Amino acid sequence: MSREVLSPPVQAMSQNRRYRVNIVHEDFGGDKWNGQNKGSKRQNQAYEEPDLYGEDDDEDDPAASNIEESPNGDFKLALHVPKSFYGGLIGLKGSTKRRIEEETRTEIYVPRQNEKSNDVVIRGKQRSQLCAALRQIRHLITSLRKKMKPTHFLAVAMNSGEVQKRFVELKKSILEAQLPGIDEELFMPERSIHLTLGVYVLLDDDERQRALKELEACRPLLADLKTPFEMKVKGLEIMNDDPSFTRILYGRVESPELQKFADQCLSHFQGTGLCATDNNERESIKLHMTLMNNRYRKEAMKAGNSFDAREILKRFGDFDFGAAQCQAVHLCVLKSRGEDEFYKISGSLQF
């Protein structure tokens, strides 16, 4: 048996990774293919990871169209990146930035915190190198965004008309019943009741404006739907299985047309990279109107992380809030209050 088969040349990929270099007949590359020359010592070359995607895949990223070629033949890309991602992009002592630069053979400049520009600048000798760096930065940002708390949500306001009036009546009836562990702080403010159609992480004005453009891009989805959306709110349910340890109590919402639109919007935004983790992991929006939430309590830690909703469900489980129409969806700021005591609205899709 050939000695070359038993003891083939080995290529070091990293500190703990070694791979055999296959022997190829010279008609198919031979020694040249294996990086060896007959009669000469083997030359050490840095391992270069093969690009399994190709430039065409990177062209799907709109930012790739902004790559510029300089007079000396080099390439440059200015990429908008919110400052909140700078720490993760740089890494401990610059390790992450340095790794991307080495793997893609590019130079990456990250603005300092006191600089006005939010553009990360990527430079390289070849366009494909910039595309590879762009792809890695995009993947890194997606990973970092998953770890961040949501900042905005898509909402249908329910704070007017019959539904709001009936909510006030239900709240009064529950409080008058003087049920153990139930107090006014558990209830959603009457001017803030809403449906949530999506939750996002938007870290600067550029991302907020982009989210509004994506929301407007959902307008064609309305063409095959009947608007305004008719909604009926009837019955009470809880998010968990045990009503004696309830965290969220909500009103059931029936609206087939709104459900279709909400699910289509969810699918659209999942492709934008702006969704919070919860939205990326779901296939459908659960239409519901939150009525009571233990997190609303100022003393939530002292009172425990749940409340007993058994008697509420027994007495008011079939409560009818009436009907409403949805004529707009709003991009709202989480944990905020506008002039009308609803959430601050960044923009809306009217229909």
Language-model features, listed with the residues they occupy:
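Histidine-dependent nucleotide/RNA phosphoesterase domain, centered on the 2H-phosphoesterase fold
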Residues: 2-351
